[in-house]
Amino acid sequence: MQTIPLPIRPTAGRWRTADVVALYELPFPELLHRAQSVHREHFDATEIQLSSLLSIKTGGCPEDCGYCSQSARHDSGLAAEKLMPLDEVLAEARAAKNAGAQRFCMGAAWRSPKPHHLEAVAEMVREVKALGLETCVTLGMLQDGQAEQLKEAGLDYYNHNLDTSPEFYGNVVTTRGYQDRLDTLARVRNAGIHVCCGGIIGMGESRRDRASLIAQLANMEPYPESVPINHLVPIPGTPLAEAAPVDVFEFIRTIAVARITMPRAKVRLSAGRQSMSEAEQALCLLAGANSIFYGASLLTTGNPQVQADRALMSKLGMRPETV
């Protein structure tokens, strides 16, 4: 039986984009076998972490991210809202926990949080954490001292995605540079908060761009503990509303490559899952995804219903992760 040699990592311990491309180009069965083997070395392959995501401040963002309906620059029809009151956030968090979620993420459409907003979010973090939920927030760019304030409140994870490769990034966002994102991630890491960082597939990027994104993530020291892989959800009124859909097998390959290059990370099957069949979702889990967003919506896009997710887990013989 012929075996295909795995691309060798450079002795410096860094993934080159060419190495990641070589992983993408493995025959599909071989790639999934390798990804599942790596997955089983570090995780129970029958467990899935269930995360819920709440938009605590929707719309009105000054950034121009081409995929996002929350940008004030796009005519998506989404009305801007103020920051949710604490009691409403806690009601949503309790409902998420009662539905089976172990992790609660809060997202705000800001370029960067103002001091009084950060104080309010810190209080949300404290109260949600007191419910026994793992906490994550995504608030935009952080300035000096802000990550430490969130750490003091007990924040577990901060999400700040790279979105795509450095080479393709300017085609998607112009109001925030790639280095701006890396600077925020450095502040998060230096404050002792776990990093949640991934990207979006299907924005018109090439396979090499996808490989470059994975290399950027895998070469972080250390690589993110949480890696959300999103499938673009085209939203009317945004610049990427007419983006051509990426082949589902290319998306599954991305999950597998993320698992191989970041063995201990939680690889999160994120936006776009609503359009996938049960079989396609099962292949993503086989490829190494071990977390899903659980609930009816993801910020401003749809998500499979809780009952559908429970039914799928039952069919696959999988179960929620034990906290």
Curated annotation (Swiss-Prot):
Gene3D superfamilies membership: Aldolase class I (3.20.20.70)
Catalysed reactions, as listed in the record: (4R,5S)-dethiobiotin + (sulfur carrier)-SH + 2 reduced [2Fe-2S]-[ferredoxin] + 2 S-adenosyl-L-methionine = (sulfur carrier)-H + biotin + 2 5'-deoxyadenosine + 2 L-methionine + 2 oxidized [2Fe-2S]-[ferredoxin]
Cofactor note as given: Binds 1 [4Fe-4S] cluster. The cluster is coordinated with 3 cysteines and an exchangeable S-adenosyl-L-methionine. Binds 1 [2Fe-2S] cluster. The cluster is coordinated with 3 cysteines and 1 arginine.
Top-level taxon: Bacteria
Entry cofactors: [4Fe-4S] cluster; [2Fe-2S] cluster
Enzyme class, first EC level, given as a word: transferase
Pathway: Cofactor biosynthesis; biotin biosynthesis; biotin from 7,8-diaminononanoate: step 2/2
Residues reported in the UniProt entry to bind [4Fe-4S] cluster: 61, 65, 68
Task performed by this protein: Catalyzes the conversion of dethiobiotin (DTB) to biotin by the insertion of a sulfur atom into dethiobiotin via a radical-based mechanism.
Stated name of the protein: Biotin synthase
Species of the source: Bordetella avium (strain 197N)
Gene that this sequence comes from: bioB
